[in-house]
Amino acid sequence: MARTTPIERYRNIGISAHIDAGKTTTTERILFYTGVSHKIGEVHDGAATMDWMEQEQERGITITSAATTAFWSGMSQQFPQHRINVIDTPGHVDFTVEVERSMRVLDGAVMVYCAVGGVQPQSETVWRQANKYEVPRIAFVNKMDRTGANFLRVVEQLKTRLGANAIPLQLPVGAEENFTGVVDLIKMKAINWNEADQGMTFTYEEVPANMQADCEEWRQNLVEAAAEASEELMEKYLGGEDLTEEEIKSALRQRVLANEIILVTCGSAFKNKGVQAMLDAVVEYLPAPTDIPAIKGINPDETEGERHASDEEPFSSLAFKIATDPFVGNLTFFRVYSGVINSGDTVLNSVRQKRERFGRIVQMHANKREEIKEVRAGDIAAAIGLKDVTTGDTLCAIDAPIILERMEFPEPVISVAVEPKTKADQEKMGLALGRLAQEDPSFRVHTDEESGETIISGMGELHLDIIVDRMKREFKVEANIGKPQVSYRETIRTRVNDVEGKHAKQSGGRGQYGHVVIDLYPLDPEGPGYEFVNEIKGGVIPGEYIPAVDKGIQEQLKSGPLAGYPVVDLGVRLHFGSYHDVDSSELAFKLAASLAFKAAFSKANPVLLEPIMKVEVETPPEYVGDVIGDLSRRRAMVNGQEANEFVVKIYAEVPLSEMFGYATDLRSQTQGRASYSMEPLKYAEAPTSVAAAVIEARKK
């Protein structure tokens, strides 16, 4: 089959925004105007096409990025048909992993902002992620019909809060309930959309007289930005010549692709105004797969390789999302970077060195599926029934293996115990959690060896709530969640010598007798964690009983004498003891060793260790004092900060036990504008008061 759309006419874009900036409604309108859906789905009714999980419709927030293919030939059918693959990304901070993951496979992004709320917190986080992956972007200021809407204020915030070189491409005609359309600053015409057909048709009109001066000033700003693309345009512009519409557009495109400017459009998705012109801007200014650098990867011999966006190159693709579909099982969303693949072909998962057969390939429209026979460079599609693929794996041609850059996912920061409401659901719960962990690399499951409980870990409290919610809805497993847990450890601070343990029962018949003398000493935390040194001389304990002594002590390490937490960083020297020809046994020596260990441990200045997290907070400068004050109250050690005019990074070490509820507290301190990440760093001695409280709680 030949290619239906040339790759130069592909646009793989993400639509990204803060919660409630109207992103899902914007995506809905894109699907409507591009002719994919015939009835507009409103988020207000809980019926939006893109938000396809029940919980999303209930909570009115987008959790899973659905990928959708749409076609667009321009508002006036002025372009040949372009294929736009839209990835809808979540806007909540607990789902930044989804955003990060979609940024990885996009070529460009539309950042949606609310004309009233402006640049909100999550917008700052998403902006930083887009910078990290160098994604060219344009902005759409939505909700121009709302009370308090102010387009130029948002443009100003893009500059001051995000450091963006924001250049308006349009100005709104009116605002709030008087918002009627936009002025196209290149054409210098007002665009008026027809309300009778939900904005499917429009007319160009003269710029309103009261806006003429403003529009000319902003057009000047736009043309100047275009002229900066090259010296010859600059000369023409400075020489007083007019630049043609073509020259302006191609120069602006060049600068957007180089991440030098952000073009700003506006409208009201809800009122069917502006999305159509924003789609034109996607086609005119955002990159095709051929406009971005070739994707880099690692060849089998560890050298660097790359794949260009071309059907001629060997097949390579990246699996960027696994979703569970109630009808067909696992759907693996993948982005094709090079080559062609047909359904039925076998490819290599180069990360796991396993072959996978592409059975059925589907193109997704929100949660509707269309089966297709082949996909080519630049396509985004989903495969059904791949066996052993997880997010971030590379699927490539067997005879040309390559591993594309792996995505990096943050370590989970919060853990809770979870148990099924009924014992009968235990196995079902295990399967459900396993399936959910496969879909979401930032979610982990393990069984706690100390308590036998199932522990789930994720990126925040909302993240885990949604996991439990999905278990109930999709897998029909009801579960109870415990309180967030901290894993403490126990160790000793001083050496003790010559502590004995004797286990003797010798009252007629076969008795039991074991006797050991040990030294106990602290080890370096960087070391092996435990060592056992046998220095028995002259056979005072026969060789066959020595392993039993080691084993008896190791069993005690699992649950320490202080509070029942694992014991770490100590060594044992066995140097004397005695035995009985008849009554000694392995069991007797095991018991003698455990008695000696308990006695020695209590004399060796035992302490409780607590996990310390490495915490990084990114906050606008005006909240630094509050953030540091709050961290200090959490027993943090602040190690330093880095600042630019928009954001301050604070580095600290904080005990994990003090970090529960931090996400919520940080949000309220900074009006939601700060974000943080944390990862385990080390164990350190807990202060006496903290240790006493933990030990007391364990006794209850």
UniProtKB/Swiss-Prot annotation:
InterPro entries in UniProt: EFG_II (IPR041095), EFG_III (IPR009022), EFG_III/V (IPR035647), EFG_IV (IPR047872), EFG_V (IPR035649), EFG_V-like (IPR000640), EFTu-like_2 (IPR004161), G_TR_CS (IPR031157)
GO biological process: ribosome disassembly
PROSITE patterns membership: G_TR_1, G_TR_2
Residue ranges constituting the tr-type G domain according to the UniProt record: 8-290
Pfam family, one: EFG_C
Subcellular location: Cytoplasm
GO molecular function: GTP binding; GTPase activity; guanosine tetraphosphate binding; translation elongation factor activity
SMART domains given in the database record: EFG_C (SM00838), EFG_IV (SM00889)
Cellular component terms (Gene Ontology): cytosol
Broad class of where this protein is predominantly found: cytoplasm
UniProt KW keywords: Cytoplasm, Elongation factor, GTP-binding, Nucleotide-binding, Protein biosynthesis
Source taxon at top rank: Bacteria
Function: Catalyzes the GTP-dependent ribosomal translocation step during translation elongation. During this step, the ribosome changes from the pre-translocational (PRE) to the post-translocational (POST) state as the newly formed A-site-bound peptidyl-tRNA and P-site-bound deacylated tRNA move to the P and E sites, respectively. Catalyzes the coordinated movement of the two tRNA molecules, the mRNA and conformational changes in the ribosome.
Protein name: Elongation factor G
Native source organism of the sequence: Haemophilus influenzae (strain ATCC 51907 / DSM 11121 / KW20 / Rd)
